[in-house]
Amino acid sequence: MRSKFEKFSLVLGGALIGILFTFNLPVFADKNNPNNLPIDKLRTFAEVFGKIKSDYVDQIGDPKLLDEALKGMLSGLDPHSVYLDKDKYKDLSQGTAGEFGGLGIEVGMKDGFVEVITPIEDTPAYNAGLKSGDLIIKLDDTLVKGLTLNDAVKLMRGKPGTSIDIRVLREDVVDPIDIKITRAQIKTKSVKAKLIEPDYAYLRVTQFQDRTGEDLAKAIKKLRKENKHAFNGIILDMRNNPGGLLTQAVSVSAAFLGDDELVVYTEGRAPDSKMRLTTAPENYIRPGGDFEKNNYIKSLPKDIKDVPMVVIINNGSASAAEIVTGALKDHKRATILGTRSFGKGSVQSILPMMNGSAIKLTTARYFTPNGTSIQGKGIEPDITVKDGTESLAYREEDIPDSLSNPQDKGKKDDKPVTNGPTPEQKEALKNFKPIKFGTDEDIQYVEALKILKGMGDQASMLKN
């Protein structure tokens, strides 16, 4: 059977930049064809190009001017559409493979500064206390304002073991924060697993790389063997998961849902952007080799699909993580606990160009099995458990020029409001250190385990 890998390669998180990340104009137009380029606008473009070439204070080469024009054309669409030069395209490929050099953060640009989208767990940036939404304003002695994202990324890269001084602005903290980070070779592990205690498994998915589904299946089988019999409960932790590959979101969903159950559907203008993705193996297995042999989800114990589950999410759970959460929630397969998710309901396609560059283009909106768009809204948990950092929450709705939610047409804006921190909280945030997930100090994790045990007690009472 033809694999969906041959049909699409979609990335739903921000680009994981390596800290994790002849011109001819047509001279005619057919008035009957609305898709032809507008001559007047092209003349204006050529005129502006000429003025920059002749009058700008510094001499700028044609390749740089045209590259910047391409960047502007993509960035003007929405926050997630970007032009990837050869270096950035290579960095993105390395990021989805799970290995890259640098600090371990997913970054973007905002107001001329480098914005921290997500610090990746167990990396130097994460351990140093960088937070989603932090704006990097200085790298060693270099001010970030005026740098391109690529230039800033190059400054942040370096030999493992060397350090860099970073100055950040943090929302609701008055003074800039100085952080020293030691660079490292980053090898991200997208799946972490442990037996919390007999009969209760903890599965943490930090992002969706090209082998996340396989790694999850291996982890489940290893824990199951260690436990010697079926689990009484599973915690699936996707907090601070920025997303990743759509195929792997389908794969993780398939581990816990029944055969051919709908995971997500997408709608866009291009024919290939209209898809209904179910848990069928052709939607996540790579092409080549023995199809049945490569079906790692089929090899899981059958009772995994019935074990009580709690999924933990927060404002850093985005895109692919929200697809999994939405599928498990809509099919009533799991109880969702934590805080409202990020709210990224769009799909980006990586489209390679002939010169070795690529564009990451928003090509579709996605919908949960029940037909809900979470764009700009996120997924509300069934049980809200805050971890004390909600005042730092940063979501899709906070990004300027983010896509609209198609289900909001004609409705007044009822965007959820995040309350700011109290003066005491502001002081505490200055010395904020990330919570170590999956430990006794993790309030949401502790509460999830209590809920699972409560489910087990109820099941026992019903049997007796």
What spans do the regions from the language model cover?
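C-terminal "post-core" interaction segments
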Residues: R2-S9, G18, V191-N464
